Design a protein with these regions (language model features):
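Catalytic cores of nucleotide-sugar-dependent glycosyltransferases that transfer UDP/GDP/TDP-activated
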Residues: 1-172
Length: 172
C-alpha cells in the first residue's frame, strides 16, 4: 500500500525506513520525494508513505489551497519512484481521484515508459469528489503526449476521476 505522508500520530508512533530519495519537477518548482517504509508491518502488509516537503508533510489530507498540486505531486512521485527503482508491479490499484491520473500517466508520459502496459484497477469510493481542476494546472503534470488531452478532459476541466474511468483497465 502506498499513501501520502501526513503528520499524524501513526507516523510518530512507528519506525520508518527511507527506501527512496529523489526529485520531481512541477512547472517551475522542484520537490524532493522521500518514500518511507513502515518497519514493523503492524498492519499486516508493507506500508509505504510518500513524503514531499512543502506538499505532503502536513497535518491533514484536505483543506489546503494547493490540494490539486499535492495530489499531482503524489502521483508523479510514486511513478517516479517505481520507474527509478525499476519496480514494475503486476497491477496498480488506484483509489478515487487522488490517484486517478496514474493510469493516464503510465500510458502517456514518456518519463514512465518503464511502467507502460502495467494493468490498472480503479476503485471509486465517493464519486462526488472528482479532483476537478482548471487546465492551467496541466503545467504541473509530467510531460505527456498532448494529442491525448481528451482523456483528461471532462466538461472543459481536467477531471482525475473521469480520467481514471476512461483509462483504467478494470474497476471493482
Amino acid at each position: 500500500v502506498i499513501m501520502p505522508w501526513y503528520n499524524k500520530p501513526f507516523v510518530h508512533d512507528h519506525s520508518f525506513e527511507l527506501v527512496f530519495d529523489g526529485w520531481i519537477h512541477q512547472h517551475d518548482q522542484t520537490f524532493q520525494v522521500m518514500v518511507m517504509k513502515e518497519r514493523s508491518k503492524i498492519l499486516g502488509f508493507d506500508l509505504y508513505l510518500v513524503k514531499i516537503p512543502g506538499l505532503l508533510d502536513r497535518e491533514n489530507p484536505y483543506g489546503y489551497w494547493d490540494e490539486s498540486q499535492q495530489f499531482l505531486a503524489f502521483q508523479h512521485g510514486v511513478l517516479h519512484w517505481l520507474t527509478a527503482m525499476k519496480i514494475r508491479p503486476d497491477i496498480l490499484h488506484c483509489h478515487d481521484y487522488h490517484t486517478g491520473l496514474v493510469p493516464f500517466m503510465i500510458e502517456n508520459c514518456p518519463e514512465f515508459n518503464f511502467l507502460k502496459g502495467v494493468k490498472t484497477v480503479g476503485t471509486i469510493h465517493n464519486g462526488e469528489y472528482q479532483g476537478q481542476m482548471r487546465w492551467e494546472m496541466a503545467k504541473y503534470f509530467p510531460w505527456f503526449y498532448g494529442e491525448n488531452w481528451g482523456l483528461l478532459d471532462w466538461n472543459g476541466y481536467i477531471n482525475p476521476l473521469a480520467t481514471m474511468i476512461k483509462c483504467c483497465h478494470a474497476f471493482n
